[in-house]
UniProtKB/Swiss-Prot annotation:
Membrane topology reported for the UniProt record: Multi-pass membrane protein
Protein name listed in UniProt: UPF0056 membrane protein PH0760
Keyword DNA repair: no
Organism name: Pyrococcus horikoshii (strain ATCC 700860 / DSM 12428 / JCM 9974 / NBRC 100139 / OT-3)
Similarity comment: Belongs to the UPF0056 (MarC) family.
Parts of the chain that traverse the membrane: 8-28, 49-69, 73-93, 111-131, 140-160, 181-201
Keywords: Cell membrane, Membrane, Transmembrane, Transmembrane helix
Subcellular location: Cell membrane
Pfam families in alphabetical order: MarC (PF01914)
Classification via NCBIfam families: NAAT family transporter
């Protein structure tokens, strides 16, 4: 039981750093910040549900993707580690998001799915990570982690106003940099493990 809790906490911490829902708050608030609480609730709920569905689907079909493309887990770990390292370095530089939204051309439902849920929160890095987790850890713990990330995403986005007020834009940037540091260390370990596995070291 204690080992399962420890594994869950490790996976959750890693996924929280990768998805970085706090970094998505400024984008979320720029779209719905002026709207009633009911609409914020609906958009935040759609984002969290989309994040959960996206990550769960890729977690469940990840092994089939490996087999279909003839790729090994070690090769995927190296490629995924490089991708995560790049993301981590961007976060360390203070970049919150490169996603731009033209509010006149999209509905709130569309924004909830793209770009907020995909790729801002459940992007390539998060998808790669859950696929790798699924091959290394208990599937039940991985799915539980995804559920926890979905709920966390909802809570953070819905509390966007309070987070911005308490942290400020500087605080959000500092948090993003901290998540970036965690992410780069995870990425390096992923690359090292992939190289060890590929070359039998």
């Amino acid at each position: 039981m204690l080992e399962a809790i420890k594994t869950f906490m490790i996976l959750y911490t890693g996924m929280f750093a990768i998805t970085n829902p706090i970094g998505a708050v400024p984008v979320f608030m720029s779209v719905v910040g002026h709207l009633p609480a009911e609409i914020k609730h609906e958009v935040a709920k759609k984002v969290s549900i989309t994040v959960f569905i996206t990550l769960t689907v890729f977690a469940l079909v990840g092994q089939w993707i490996f087999k279909f493309f003839g790729s090994s887990i070690d090769a995927f770990a190296i490629a995924g580690g490089i991708l995560l390292f790049r993301m981590g370095m961007e976060m360390l530089s203070g970049k919150l998001s490169s996603v731009k939204i033209d509010e006149e051309d999209v509905t709130l439902e569309e924004v909830a799915v793209i770009p907020l849920a995909i790729p801002l929160i459940s992007g390539p890095g998060a998808i790669t990570t859950v696929m790798l987790y699924m091959t290394k850890e208990s599937p039940g713990i991985v799915i539980l982690t995804i559920i926890a990330i979905g709920l966390t995403t909802y809570g953070i986005l819905y509390s966007g106003n309070k987070i911005i007020e308490r942290l400020g834009r500087v605080g959000v940037k500092v948090t993003t940099r901290m998540m970036g540091l965690i992410l780069t260390s995870m990425a390096m370990q992923m690359i090292i493990n992939g190289i060890k596995g590929a070359f039998g070291i």
